[in-house]
Amino acid sequence: MDDSKKRTISRETLEAVKSKMNPVLLNALPASPEEILAFAQRRTDPVISKNIDRNLAEKMRAFRLSDEDYLMTLFMAMGDVFYNREQSENPTASILLAQTGAGKTNLRTSLLQKNPDTIIINSDQYKKFRPDAEAILTTDPTHFGALTGIDSYDHASNITDFAMAHSYDLLIECAPSLQQGLIGVDLEALKQAGYDTKFHVMAVGDLISALAIHLRYEHELALGRPNGETKLTDLKRHNESYLALEKIIKELDAEAVSIYRRGTEGEGRRPIKICDAKEPSEILADARAKSNEEYIKTGGFRRDHKLILEAMKHRRAPQLQQDQLAEVYKMFINYIEQNQEL
């Protein structure tokens, strides 16, 4: 497996896609379909995390879109992402770093208020445009994120490359990987393109985020609006991204790193920047531990866990999802045993 090997999509495929797409959608693109085609590159042999079991990895490869569907999905995503956005004279790149379920969405909202022209790079946001998104959500909701992951990461890479070539401000959301590092972030390319790059890190304990991926999923299902962004993240992926951030933050320029904690209810739940003279890795570790402790002491974990259990029972959740929640509860018990004062 080698993420560096990529291939392009043919002009014949482009013409087929153009003939099937609504002219209004084509007109909404930030450049001509022909220009965008040059950025529509796909990995030939994508790297898949070692934490993914062999059967699921094979299914992920099997669910890759055809070139025609891939290009059509890219066009629809770009029409949405670049709508009413302006290019920048002095482009900036804001890199949002956190494990899955840590609350990157709230931090994203806060940063976008300062610069609404920013292009959001978030692979989950493009999945809803896949022609098979609804079918996958219906037949295998547990693995929706994984089955659509290869194409969505490639779409994110295509959109990033286009945005950089045209000097758009960027906001890249990343749940890092031990194997792949800052997925979708090429720091050297950003530097070469003249971007001022800053890192914004959410410091949230693993008990909170591991349960949050379940709570978020149940909330979306309860509202009756599952879509391409509705997924139950695999717990192994969550745990890997949690550990990866500990490693990666030590390699970043401390001057370019800002760390945030989750805001309380009295603070409007907005992310609060932590001002501390310590090294970023120390700030991250301390804030994570403190958030876990508060979550346990205030009864938050048991309350949310009970709520999720009731929701799962009500909808007769698949056994795989129940098993994953049981693993999260084991994490909680282990944490209690290792921290007797709690």
Regions inferred by a protein language model and the residue ranges of each:
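Hydrophobic positions on the alpha1 helix immediately C-terminal to the Walker A/P-loop
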Residues: 107, 111
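Conserved GTP-binding G-domain of TRAFAC-class P-loop NTPases and closely related GTPase folds
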Residues: 211-342
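N-terminal pre-Walker A segment at the start of P-loop NTPase domains
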Residues: 52-87
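Conserved nucleotide-sensing/catalytic segment adjacent to the nucleotide-binding pocket
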Residues: 118-188
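Pre-Walker A (Motif I) flank of P-loop NTPase domains
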Residues: 88-94, 166-168
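Conserved glycine(s) of the Walker
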Residues: 103-104
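The conserved Walker
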Residues: 99-100
